[in-house]
Amino acid sequence: MLLTLILPLHPTEFTTKNNKRMMDETASLFDRLGGDSAVDAVVDEFYTRLLKDKGLSMFFEGVSIAKLKRHQKRFLKMAFTKIPESLDVPKMMLDKHKRLFAMGLDESHFDKVTGHLGDALNSLGVATDLKDEAIAVVVPFRASFEQGAAIAKTAHTGIDSTSD
């Protein structure tokens, strides 16, 4: 199912004389993906994949998936438009995932999660260039997962693995 089927002609798209659909180049990634409906579909597919992954599902035990999806949708909307300069995303990532870092969450899990996001986008027929752009928005957050895992390991062992 293509995301353009969710929103057949998004306001940022226009039709040329040859009836080719074009995107307004100034539109945000969020809008080019198809807006709220498209991101909702991506997040739903994304969480289906995350919950089926035995290497990740343990991190979701005992939490409200509906609440997580709402947070994820808001975060992706922000990330795919423009993250406010006043928002310290690395700190937010560390704070929001602190319990999970203590459970062993690390950059290898981040890589799996990012892979599932790419697979969700692919399964919904998102164009490769848009999928690549979406993944490129998320990849810089990997450093927060490396840092969070190192902090949790230090707290657990008392050994600082980040120093030489």
Predicted regions and their residues:
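Acidic/proline-rich low-complexity IDRs
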Residues: M1-P8, S123, D129
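Short, Lys/Arg-enriched N-terminal segments with co-localized hydrophobic residues
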Residues: L3-M22
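Short non-domain terminal segments
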Residues: T12, S57-M58, A143
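Heme-based O2/NO sensor domains and their adjacent alpha-helical segments
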Residues: M23-A27, D40-V126, K131-V137, A150
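Short terminal or interdomain "cap/linker" segment that borders an active site or interface and mediates
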Residues: D24-A27, A136-D164
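Long, hydrophobic N-terminal alpha-helical segment
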Residues: L29-V39
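Intrinsically disordered, low-complexity segments enriched in small/polar residues
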Residues: R32-L33, A102, H156
